[in-house]
């Protein structure tokens, strides 16, 4: 009986996933935009740290992470993994932030406590191969986050490749105050802070004749996703506002990235 119940639940999940795919294609196919359906993953790093803090508080229940992340993109070119980053683009240029230009950076994947260290040139392959983070390509894409109703903490992440660089999009559901979850969305450049200053990203929510835009300069992944969210330098939505723009538990975020100035290495070319 238990086996039958598990199989039936798996079938329902597949039906739900197919419905999400159909809905994404139906809504955005007319605009010709690349759409990626992203399921949430519980933030194991945040959960682990919270467990360590709450071990001395037995009245708080333990949290069991579940719901693996899956990315489903709709575009004929989305399977191609292209590495546009050039080695001479990726040196650490901020002496105050990095005294040693060859200091390796830590893994910035917000989902896991990963002990990996490496140079910026190999961050993208690491996220792609070890953490299974998919890559979308194109100047304008649509990020469709599903199951927004799941309890915090949860993350939806994807990499975005355009203008010869890779960006990391993170949507996080987190409780800053107990019982009051919020959604935080930010775009970070997989590069140095100097390179990040050369770009502008825009996040747009659009539903039922309502539109909400957030436009900012991306932060570098060297500055850590957690610090960006703590500083509030990102799009912040409370639960009621997120529900206003969501459709059947899914939130569609339009993403656009533009170059605000020509990088020195590109000007030489």
Curated annotation (Swiss-Prot):
One Gene Ontology MF term: ubiquitin protein ligase activity
Gene3D superfamilies: Apoptosis, Tumor Necrosis Factor Receptor Associated Protein 2, Chain A (2.60.210.10), Classic Zinc Finger (3.30.160.60)
SUPFAM superfamilies with a match to the protein in the record: TRAF domain-like (SSF49599)
KW Zinc (keyword) present: yes
Main subcellular localisation: mitochondrion
Family under the similarity heading: Belongs to the SINA (Seven in absentia) family.
Protein name according to UniProt: Seven in absentia homolog 3
Organism expressing this protein natively: Homo sapiens
